[in-house]
Amino acid sequence: MNVSRLALAVVEPHIEVLNPFDGSIVGTVADVCASEVPHLLETGRSGARACAALPRHRRASILEQAALNIERDAKAFARLIVDEAGKTLKQAEKEVKRCVNTLKLSAEEAKRNAGEIVPFDAYEGAESRQGWFTREPLGLIVAITPYNDPLNLVAHKLGPAIAGGNAVILKPSELAPLSALKLVSYLVAAGLPETVVTVATGGAELGKALVAARDVRMISFTGGFVTGEQIARTAGLKKLAMDLGGNAPVIVMGDCNLDAAVDSCVSGAFWAAGQNCIGTQRLLIHAPIYEAFRERFVNQAQALVVGNPLLANTDIGPMITQQAAQNAEQMVNEALQQGATLLCGHRRQGNCYGATVLENVDHSSRIWRNEAFAPVVVLQVFETFDEAIALANEPEYALHAGIFTNDLSTAMSAARRIEAGGVMINDSSDFRFDAMPFGGSKYGSLGREGVRFAYEEMTQPKVVCLNVLG
């Protein structure tokens, strides 16, 4: 049973996918219950055999063809992302381009990363032996994806998994599953056997049953820390790869290009309505330029247009649900009650929440310690570089960080000392290239994504050793 076949039909029970901006019904998907998991696993086992049997050139050609077809139909994909996830049209168009690139990178990985020669004769006592290791599929992988990048984050699970010869049971966010379903349909149209990727749309109980299933060899999860902890407790002896969130700092030194820093940080803070795990949340600004930076940053933030994501001039679309917008509002209210100063924003209308900038934030507040996942940014002054590093490293969640400086020694010192999975120099924390390793430190993640690195997580080495006798 491939649940993706049911997804666009009205079935009972079903989930209505709502447009975050106007509340209209974008589509319906099956609400798959936990009792269906044995059927999903049966399909997954069959798919694992089918994908492992595909030669590498065939896996690559399927991924390449799907990428070309998505590129051809980019406008339709972008519109679907806008409708179900609320991204602005320009943001959705960028996500489609990244998805195409992710699939192309995965196709290349299928052909390139096949193993290595093992130099057995480098060790005394093994001179008569020759051999190598190959990279073999794990088997069946469960991938659980969020709503904020409903197409490209799915591609980051499926592309490397298929390249490595695995099958996947994909559970996309029930808030925005339609882009995932469309992507899978394009993979099947490109020649992927239907059993290789099974899309199962449903709620938390379905997810728990999939995570606990013994036939599953790996869980690849992108989402919140609390859910990640629950998965780790439930999964048992399975491989885990998790991107759990961040609270990204960006240090702005007094010697930087101020205009470039402001422009980049505005984009990094408010892209996708702040619903971005590497979005800039804390701006740490050198005292000599604090007032100048604050004035320019606040002016740009106030100029951002909030509203209908289909309009060309919209900068910030809606948050995914009204509850998400209310949570952001509540987090800011708490900070204000603890003495923070509001510089702009903090206006909510339905699911829309305007660009919000705070200063004088208490470091015990949630907005400082936790991931906001909203268009909210904190400005914090510092006097010395050592102080900036200490401030950057305070939270438990660390994916990306950034620093703006014209001094190479300062930049490299920050790269060494900031606790994060990536340090962007003269960029906001929000920069990501889909080929680079992606993940965090502390409680930010387990393992790494990025096509090559996900491929290695989703495969395992197998040694072949030949003893040449005589």
UniProtKB/Swiss-Prot annotation:
Gene Ontology MF, one: lactaldehyde dehydrogenase (NAD+) activity
Organism of provenance: Pseudomonas canavaninivorans
Leader sequence residues: none
Enzyme class: oxidoreductase
Sequence similarity: Belongs to the aldehyde dehydrogenase family.
Lineage of the organism: Bacteria, Pseudomonadati, Pseudomonadota, Gammaproteobacteria, Pseudomonadales
Active site positions, chain numbering: 243, 277
Name of the protein described by the UniProt record: Aspartate-semialdehyde dehydrogenase 1
Upregulating conditions: Up-regulated upon growth on canavanine.
EC number(s) recorded for this UniProt protein: 1.2.1.-
Catalytic activity as recorded in UniProt: L-aspartate 4-semialdehyde + NAD(+) + H2O = L-aspartate + NADH + 2 H(+)
Record Pfam families: Aldedh
CDD domains assigned: ALDH_y4uC
Binding site for NAD(+): 145, 171, 245, 371
Record keywords, A-Z: NAD, Oxidoreductase
Function as written in the Swiss-Prot or TrEMBL entry: Dehydrogenase involved in the degradation of canavanine, the delta-oxa-analog of arginine, allowing growth on canavanine as sole nitrogen and carbon source. Probably catalyzes the NAD(+)-dependent oxidation of L-aspartate-semialdehyde to L-aspartate.
